């Protein structure tokens, strides 16, 4: 075996980390230098240190590893940028070309014109964007980024309430909960930490009641929940506000905890004299509109009786967990729903106690995974940073971007982006919003003058490269990773097989570029990948896990992974709960800030209120804002009639408990008719088991199990003459896509669901045949976090009949076809 691996044919290895939300363990069967089979974790299984079992994506990795469409040689563009026409070149020509462009752009414009975009296609310590950032930082720096595509609003909103992102108890503590609200959370598909779904299952077996609130009946709702409550996308804050109304008016909130541990709840504890308190907002003292369940019903399509019942259950089932998913904060005003969930946890006193949950991001106590990256990327000499989602703005108008655009580290950018080095990312095209807009930006070579893409396949983003560098998979090089978000594990990724063709590891590519740029020794420090793995393990042991085995012990004992056992689960804010004066939070007040003075001082109460409020989205079934003041839910007075489902529930005085997906009869009519006549349907995009974002989209094993299709309710389908399995056109003013449909009551009426991550495959007119939802999404961002609001979409759906027999997209016609299927 390579590099002193034990002479056996089964090697424990970390599941290649593509940011699925998990960190799992595989067992690779190796014969004659080839991986022949992948199993999952076979180690002992305990509650304190459970097995890290891989999902179907990890188990299907063998197909990706030996896919016939792997990039084998460096490529150089020969046609129009984006056309997908390339020729093979040598590594020397590729390295020289890239190095020359690096030098040219740096000296012509300055280091801030260089850019490494966000990307998680290779998410361990030694591969992917980490090594590219180390290269750039040693070379003089590049334009920096902050925040993420995944949870930008959560990242910035959570600390405005708690002063930290470490708001989660260790997951073993969920077994102490009596009640769990899975609010827009789908761990069975998107993972959110290996074993999160397993711990929910154990909590339910221990007696916890589990309720899932989601527009779609997800696999998590089906497998883990006692009840599914469909809710109109983008209205979660309205339901949370109405729940607070029930708690306040019925005396169900924890008044003692609120008095001693919170600020901003009522007039006597306001950080700003005379400002509106949370209690006044909920009761409608100033705007004359109490946030009652009836008020929320017409907004959310959730029956008022159901809202009241869930409020009572959550408030009286202490300790209870309200776990927020991330899709609902990737929307217009996504910061509001994050803060609203935190406030519900606070006013019910579910903070700092076993079985409770403070909500927010929920990084795990005690350390929260705050030391994820131990591979030294170094300090960026360029201090300017932009929000990760606004990189296309920096391509178009970087020199005009200021703090008003989220710029940090400088008053104003001094450059537009002129060179992009994209490593293990499909965010240039596929995963970024408003694809057709991005295509137009990147095709204009007077804007971004040079693009390098480094990947395993010719992805949608790769098609816009000037140079493509073929990278190893993570079975073909050394790597190490730790637990995703929950951080209890360190997982080894030993090199198992040799790379095919001329593929090189991300580290080796960057090392050879560094040599040409005159910083070779500084970049490698005399280490190869294996030596850097040893360095990372030593760092983990020094600063975080003193009992972590050495690299030699990992290899000799074929450990694969090491877990810090959770014998006594850590509880976030336990000390603060016990003595808030001795152990204050890091907020300005030292307490839980229901009212944020920081947000108040921004002076934008319509879009960034100091207390969490429901704000109508800019694309909404309720139409355009009736007036500027009407952006706040408190001022909305549109005539919204109750849904038929809500009326039936009200008549019976008990909301229907849907343990299975609802039947068509249970949705006897759509929710309130959309006021958006042109694009009347809301569209959402869930994380499918077919892919990890866009990774695996060309894996036909997974595509067979989870085909790309749009999910539409029978009511919406029948009114459009659409049958199950028909090809349909989904479109709005930004673009159109063609894909098959699945007619099912597992998505609520008025909403369609398109699994995110499918590779963009346009025809010559720009219509996408790959099923990529980002053809439809908007590049608008959230007001406080400057984060993606891609889930705020209105669309229309209609039957589609191709006018061209045997139509194929331009992408599929390319010589280097990223989606070629094999037998």
Where are these regions (language model features)?
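Long, contiguous, secondary-structure-rich segments that constitute the structural scaffold
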Residues: 506-557, 694-696, 700-711, 715-823
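Glycine-rich phosphate/diphosphate-binding loops that line cofactor/substrate pockets in enzymes
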Residues: 95-114, 170-179, 287-288, 308-321, ...
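N-terminal export/assembly segments and adjacent metallocofactor-ligating motifs
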Residues: 1-252, 278-281, 423, 613, ...
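Phosphate/diphosphate-binding loops
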Residues: 4, 14-15, 440, 446-450, ...
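Active-site phosphate/pyrophosphate-binding segments
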Residues: 243, 268-397
């Amino acid at each position: 075996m390579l590099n002193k691996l034990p002479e056996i044919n089964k090697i424990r290895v970390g599941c290649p980390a593509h940011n699925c939300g998990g960190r799992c363990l595989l067992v690779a069967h190796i014969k004659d230098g080839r991986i022949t089979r992948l199993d999952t974790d076979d180690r002992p299984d305990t509650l304190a240190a459970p097995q890290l079992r891989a999902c179907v994506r990890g188990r299907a990795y063998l197909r990706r590893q030996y896919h016939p469409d792997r990039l084998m040689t460096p490529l150089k563009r020969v046609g129009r940028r984006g056309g997908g026409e390339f020729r093979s070149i040598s590594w020397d020509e590729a390295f020289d070309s890239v190095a020359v462009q690096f030098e040219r752009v740096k000296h012509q414009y300055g280091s801030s014109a260089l850019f490494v975009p966000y990307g998680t296609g290779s998410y361990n310590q030694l591969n992917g964007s980490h090594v590219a950032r180390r290269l750039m930082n040693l070379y003089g720096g590049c334009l920096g980024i902050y925040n993420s595509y995944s949870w930008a609003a959560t990242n910035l909103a959570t600390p405005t309430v708690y002063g930290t992102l470490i708001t989660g108890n260790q997951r073993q503590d969920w077994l102490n909960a009596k009640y769990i609200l899975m609010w827009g959370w789908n761990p069975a598909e998107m993972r959110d930490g290996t074993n999160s779904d397993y711990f929910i299952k154990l909590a339910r077996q221990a007696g916890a009641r589990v309720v899932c609130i989601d527009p779609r009946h997800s696999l998590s709702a089906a497998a883990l929940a006692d009840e599914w409550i469909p809710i109109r996308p983008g209205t979660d804050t309205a339901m949370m506000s109405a729940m607070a109304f029930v708690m306040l008016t019925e005396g169900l909130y924890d008044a003692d905890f609120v008095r001693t541990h919170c600020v901003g709840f009522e007039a006597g504890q306001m950080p700003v004299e005379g400002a509106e308190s949370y209690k006044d907002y909920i009761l409608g003292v100033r705007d004359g509109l109490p946030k009652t369940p009836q008020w929320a019903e017409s907004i959310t399509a959730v029956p008022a009786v159901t809202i009241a019942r869930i409020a009572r259950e959550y408030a009286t089932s202490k300790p209870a967990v309200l776990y927020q998913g991330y899709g609902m904060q990737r929307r217009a005003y996504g910061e509001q729903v994050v803060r609203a969930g935190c406030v519900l946890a606070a006013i019910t006193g579910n903070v700092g106690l076993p079985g409770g949950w403070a909500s927010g991001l929920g990084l795990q106590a005690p350390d929260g995974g705050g030391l994820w990256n131990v591979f030294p990327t170094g300090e960026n000499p360029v201090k300017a940073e932009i929000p990760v989602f606004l990189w296309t703005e920096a391509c178009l108008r970087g020199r005009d971007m200021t703090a008003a655009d989220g710029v940090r580290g400088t008053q104003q950018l001094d450059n537009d982006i002129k060179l992009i080095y994209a490593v293990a990312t499909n965010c240039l095209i596929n995963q970024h919003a408003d694809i057709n807009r991005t295509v137009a930006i990147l095709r204009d070579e007077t804007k971004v003058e040079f693009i390098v893409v480094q990947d395993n396949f010719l992805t949608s983003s790769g098609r816009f490269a000037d140079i493509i560098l073929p990278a190893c998979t993570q079975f073909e090089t050394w790597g190490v990773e730790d637990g995703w978000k929950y951080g209890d594990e360190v997982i080894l990724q030993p090199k198992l097989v040799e790379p095919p063709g001329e593929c090189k590891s991300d580290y080796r590519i960057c090392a050879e570029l560094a040599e040409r740029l005159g910083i070779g020794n500084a970049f490698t420090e005399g280490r190869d990948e294996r030596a850097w793995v040893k360095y990372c393990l030593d760092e983990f042991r020094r600063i975080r896990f003193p009992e972590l085995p050495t690299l030699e012990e990992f290899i000799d004992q074929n450990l694969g992974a090491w877990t810090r056992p959770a014998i006594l689960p850590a509880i976030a804010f336990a000390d603060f709960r016990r003595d808030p004066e001795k152990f204050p939070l890091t907020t300005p007040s030292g307490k839980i800030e229901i009212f944020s003075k920081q947000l108040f001082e921004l002076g934008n109460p319509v879009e960034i209120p100091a207390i969490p409020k429901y704000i109508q989205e800019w694309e909404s079934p309720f139409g355009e804002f009736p007036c500027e003041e009407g952006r706040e839910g408190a001022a909305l007075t549109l005539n919204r009639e109750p849904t038929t489902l809500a009326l039936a529930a009200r008549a019976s005085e008990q909301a229907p408990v849907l343990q299975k997906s609802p039947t068509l009869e249970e949705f006897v009519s759509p929710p309130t008719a959309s006021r958006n006549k042109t694009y009347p349907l809301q569209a959402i995009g869930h994380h499918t088991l077919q892919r990890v974002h866009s990774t695996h989209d060309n894996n036909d094993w997974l595509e067979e199990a989870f085909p790309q299709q749009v999910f539409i309710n029978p009511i919406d389908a029948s009114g459009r003459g659409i049958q199950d399995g028909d090809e349909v056109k989904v479109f709005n003013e930004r673009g159109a896509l063609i894909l098959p449909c699945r007619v099912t009551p597992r998505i609520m009426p008025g909403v369609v669901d398109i699994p995110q991550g499918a590779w963009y495959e346009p025809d010559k007119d720009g219509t996408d045949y790959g099923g990529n939802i980002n053809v439809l999404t908007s590049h608008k961002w959230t007001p406080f976090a400057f984060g993606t609001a891609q889930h705020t979409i209105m669309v229309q759906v209609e039957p589609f009949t191709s006018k061209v027999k045997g139509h194929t997209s331009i992408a599929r016609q390319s010589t280097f076809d990223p989606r070629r299927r094999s037998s």
